[in-house]
Every structure is written in C-alpha cells, then in structure tokens.
Amino acid sequence: MQKKEIIILCGPTASGKSYLGHALAKACDGEIINIDSMQVYKEIPIITASPPESYKSEIPYHLYNFLPITEDFSVVKYLKLAAEKINQVTASGKLPILIGGTGLYINSLVFGYNNIPDISEDLRQQVRKLHNEIGNTELHNRLTKLDPLASSKINQSDTQRLIRAYEVVLQTGKSIFSFQTLPKEQILSEFNFKIIFLNPERKFLYKICDERLANIFKDGAIDEIALIKKQFNPDYLNLKAVGIKEILAYLENKLTLSEALNLAQTRTRRYAKRQITWFKHQIKEKITLDYSNEEDFLQVTRKLSILIDLPNSNK
C-alpha cells in the first residue's frame, strides 16, 4: 500500500518558512501544522513570530498559540497532538504541511522518540515548591545524589532541564538519560515524510534575522513580555524563545533597549547557525533549497510545487 505524504518545511529561524509554507498550502490544497516548540504558547505570538491572523483566515492552521505558558509541554505531548491533526487533515483529503525549526520534534516525528513517562501534577508542584525554597545549587546537589549521570550533564544554571531531570528521577526512579537507550517508538509509520530544508546564504540570513527581530521589538514584543512578567514568575515558564531573556533584562533595568536588542540579535544569529548545522548533519534525506537574496527566494517560492512533485494551482 502506498504511504500517505507529509511535507515538513524546516530551516533556520527567519528563513521564510511561514511565507513559503503558506504559499505552498494555498497552491497544493494543504493545511499547516506547527512543528515549533515555542509557537504553541498563546501568550507569546509576537516574540515567537507566529503566523499572522491574515494567514490563518485564508487556510487552516493547527497547533499554534493554543497552550498556556504555565502548562508543561513535552515532545511526547506534541507528537500525540500532531499525529491527531495529521490524521484529521489527511482524512479530509488535504495535504499536511508541517512548518518549524525545532529539531527534536522533527527528529522524533520522522525517526521515532524515547517515551519518558508523564509527571504527575502533584509531583510537579512539589518540585517547583522545593526549588523555590532551596534554589538551583541545592537542587542540583540533590539531583547528584539521585541521578549522578543527569547532574553531570546538566548545568545547575539550566533551571528547566534541572527541574525536569529531578521530576523524572522522582517519578520513575530512573535517570532521564536512561530512556534514551530504549528502542524508539514510531508514531506515524504509515506516512512518507518529504522534508524540505531552506538553506539561505549565511550573510543574507543574518541580515534578515537582525531586521526581523528589530521589527518584533517594535511591534509589541516588549509589552507582551512585560505582561507575562507581571502575571507569572518567568523562572518557572518554558520561555526559551530568543529575545525573551533580553527583554526581561531590559524591563529589570539591567540592559538598555539597544543593548537588549543587540544581544538578542547576536543570540538569534548563533541559534540560526546551530539550526543549520543540525539540519545538515541530522536529516540526510531532504530537498535543500539554496538562496542568497530576495529574488532567489521568490523564485524558490514559485517553483516549489514543481520541485516536490505536487499539483500546482498556478496561484
């Protein structure tokens, strides 16, 4: 039996995935499913550069900006939701087009994942209360006694990973890293994945990264993060999107606005570089689209339906 098709449009931040994916979905009767770990959160659409409402009014978008930032989210939870949406889209006769740059999600979807048990809400609250009382250093010391492997791999300044490892060892009695040795579970084995990798020339990409982040800062990101800071304790939130840390520092008068923007731009460029390296080495079978300027990118947009052998409505 011929496998059903899924398109994954991936690449570094600011590479044009949203624009290109939207054009592709319109041309090929597709629906878009998020595969970015930060764009799931509903309180931070601006800083995460989530698709605009104008896009969402034209075609269906799934798994964007739906989850409260107070809710814990994992790759396993993502995969279950993504599989559900993919099956719904294909059942309706549409083409699922997954867009994003989170390597862990893409790798787990395509090649399988390590199923780490969910943490009970009671235990989660207990660990967060404990961390609030004793801090990172002491929690890291306690993790060393329970799980020396995890403590050796996790820096005590990495609050999220530290708490996660401590929760897992308390819940399961096993190191979080022990689950990586188990056979991987496949969630969508009946599908064929066609992976498209956007690979802009480095200098051009860095220019776009800088410009986009400057616009994001101007277009409401500061107010967005200020509201979160007012309502929640950022230490316990999964706020890893580039720019959030710098805006928080600005709001706490630790950086000027210019310093915050410059630092965030530097981090964005480094993040983009890491993403490119990851995709080049981890995803072997893919269609790579190279471009070095805006005209090249527009040409890629026009030709994409033909390149991946899908019907084109000539839009």
Curated annotation (Swiss-Prot):
| Transcription keyword on record | no
What InterPro entries does this protein's entry cite?
A: Dimethylallyltransferase (IPR039657), IPT (IPR018022), P-loop_NTPase (IPR027417)
Recorded catalytic activity of this chain's protein: adenosine(37) in tRNA + dimethylallyl diphosphate = N(6)-dimethylallyladenosine(37) in tRNA + diphosphate
What are the record keywords, sorted?
A: ATP-binding, Magnesium, Nucleotide-binding, Transferase, tRNA processing
Obligatory cofactor(s)? Mg(2+)
Report the SUPFAM superfamilies cross-referenced here: P-loop containing nucleoside triphosphate hydrolases
Q: Where is this site: Interaction with substrate tRNA?
A: 102, 124
Q: Which GO terms describe its molecular function?
A: ATP binding; tRNA dimethylallyltransferase activity
Ligand binding (ATP): 11-18
Domain of life of the source = Bacteria
**Pfam families in UniProt:** IPPT
Q: Which residues bind substrate?
A: 13-18
Record EC number: 2.5.1.75
Q: Where are the residues of the annotated region Interaction with substrate tRNA?
A: 36-39, 160-164
Per the record, the GO terms for biological process are: tRNA modification
Indicate the quaternary assembly: Monomer.
Q: What does this protein do?
A: Catalyzes the transfer of a dimethylallyl group onto the adenine at position 37 in tRNAs that read codons beginning with uridine, leading to the formation of N6-(dimethylallyl)adenosine (i(6)A).
Q: Which PANTHER family match?
A: TRNA DIMETHYLALLYLTRANSFERASE
Q: Which family does it belong to?
A: Belongs to the IPP transferase family.
Please give the name of this protein.
tRNA dimethylallyltransferase
* Species of provenance: Rickettsia bellii (strain OSU 85-389)
Q: What is the lineage of its organism?
A: Bacteria, Pseudomonadati, Pseudomonadota, Alphaproteobacteria, Rickettsiales
Q: What gene is this protein a product of? A: miaA
